[in-house]
């Protein structure tokens, strides 16, 4: 079990089953999780929990505000580690993300 007090991982994905899969895995390891179903909600949750989020797992393609836009806005004020989830495995997309400040990629689907 991980002993993390008042720190959260933020899981952002428009697919509820994907959020649940990631959340269940991390909770079983002892992490506290916050969730958002779109980019706008992700920014709200991030701002409401300023300084308490230790990691963001962020989907690229979402309604309202995509992962790239969320990443850009967060990088204006924070260097919190961000892992992007993407169904697109093209190298050009990964390079674009790294230029914007993403820390790592996970391709969907994953097992």
Region roles according to the model:
Residues 1-10:
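Non-catalytic signal-transmission and effector/linker regions of two-component phosphorelay proteins
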Residues 20-28:
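Charged docking surfaces used in two-component/phosphorelay signaling
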Residues 35-55:
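Acidic, metal-coordinating helix/loop segments flanking the phosphotransfer/catalytic sites
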Residues 38-41, 66-69, 93:
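Acidic catalytic/metal-coordinating carboxylates
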Residues 44-47, 68-79:
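Short amphipathic alpha-helix used as the core "switch/output" element in two-component signaling
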Residues 59, 86:
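Active-site residues of response regulator receiver
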Residues 62:
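Receiver (REC) domain active-site loop signature in two-component systems and cognate sites
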């Amino acid at each position: 079990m991980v002993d993390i007090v008042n720190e959260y991982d933020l899981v952002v994905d428009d697919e509820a089953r994907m959020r649940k899969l990631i959340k269940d895995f991390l909770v079983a390891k002892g992490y506290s999780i916050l969730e958002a179903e779109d980019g706008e909600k992700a920014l709200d949750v991030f701002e409401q929990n300023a300084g308490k989020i230790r990691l963001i797992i962020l989907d690229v393609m979402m309604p309202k505000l995509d992962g790239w836009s969320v990443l850009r806005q967060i990088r204006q004020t924070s260097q919190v580690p961000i892992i992007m989830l993407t169904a697109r495995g093209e190298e050009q997309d990964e390079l674009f993300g790294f230029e914007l400040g993403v820390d790592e990629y996970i391709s969907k689907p994953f097992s």
